[in-house]
Every structure is written in structure tokens, then in C-alpha cells.
Amino acid sequence: MLVPQLVVRAAVPADLEQVTAIYAHYVTTSVATFEEVPPTAADWRRRLDDLAGRNLPFLVAESGPVVGGYAYAAPWRPKPAYRHTVEDTVYVSPARTGRGIGSALLAALLPGCERAGARQVIAVIADTGSDASIALHRRFGFAQAGRLSAVGCKHGRWIDTILMQRQLGPSQ
């Protein structure tokens, strides 16, 4: 049987039900995200529209009709001087991890960030159960820039975050 090829493309509203399901898994079962209530498809539509309005990339990786993962870049902080710094988000369907989907998404996301005018990309990664995310970011040139201790409390335990950073474009 032929397996459909993986395609990374811009997210569209029709993808958001699958994006919602992927993220809901991580919200409810892990500390990969500090959200505690899964956003609805309507919430995701607002995020998609907001990022599109800022010319920031929101991508999905699909194989046939199945969205296997998604990635997007959002503003790092709201203050104007941070306008050239974004935070990346990459999630892969739990049924499709270990297949290169995260790598395909991040490989497409970084040039999209650069086209949007970003100079720095920050990854904020929970230090518990996130070895794959840390390894993914290292493979793409991110370096650890810091650690914040006990900044989140989810599922009854305190969680540290690791900050990873990658510069885009020419050096300063």
C-alpha cells in the first residue's frame, strides 16, 4: 500500500478541527503546554486569523487528508521593541511522532519567520518529558539560552521551562 507523501503547507480553516484534536491531547495529558483547558476550533480560528494578520507562518504537515502536526510563530512579547522576535510552537499528533514531521515543520517554519522579518526565534520548552523537542530544536541550530525554575504548575507539580534561541538572518 502506498503511503501518501508528507506535505507542509499553510494552515487553512478546514485544518483546525484536526489541529484542535492534536493540541487537546497535549493540554490534557502532558506538561508540554501550560494551557489547562483545550482551546476550541473557534479559538484556533482566532489564532490563525491573528497570525495571518501579522504575516506570521502557521503551517500544517499533512499526509493525505490527515494533519499529522502543525507549527506556527507568534510574537514573543507584546512590547514594540520585541517585534523582531517570535516564539515557535511545534506539535505532532501522538500517533505520528518519530516520523520526521516535527523536522519537516520546523524546516519550513524558520524561513517563514525570516520572511516575516523575525531576527530571533525563541522556543519555550517544559523540562519534563520534552527530550524530543529539545533535540529537534538543537538539530535546527537552537542553543539553550536559559532556564526558568518552577514557573508553571500543572497536574499537581511544578515545572521548569528551558528557553532555546536561534538567530535568523545575518549576524548583528
Language-model regions, residue ranges each:
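Conserved GNAT acetyl-CoA-binding A-motif
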Residues: 113-126
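Conserved catalytic-core motifs of GNAT/GCN5-like acyltransferases
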Residues: 72-75, 124-125, 138, 143-160
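Conserved acetyl-CoA-binding loop-helix of GNAT-fold acetyltransferases
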Residues: 98-113, 131-139
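Conserved GNAT-fold acetyl-CoA-binding loop/helix
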Residues: 20-48
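A short beta-loop-alpha structural element at the N-terminal edge
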Residues: 7-19
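Active-site acidic-Proline motif in GNAT/NAT acetyltransferases
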Residues: 90-95, 99, 127-129
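Acetyl-CoA-dependent GNAT
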Residues: 38-95, 106-107, 112, 167-169
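C-terminal "cap" of GNAT-fold acetyltransferases
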Residues: 5, 84-86, 140, 150-172
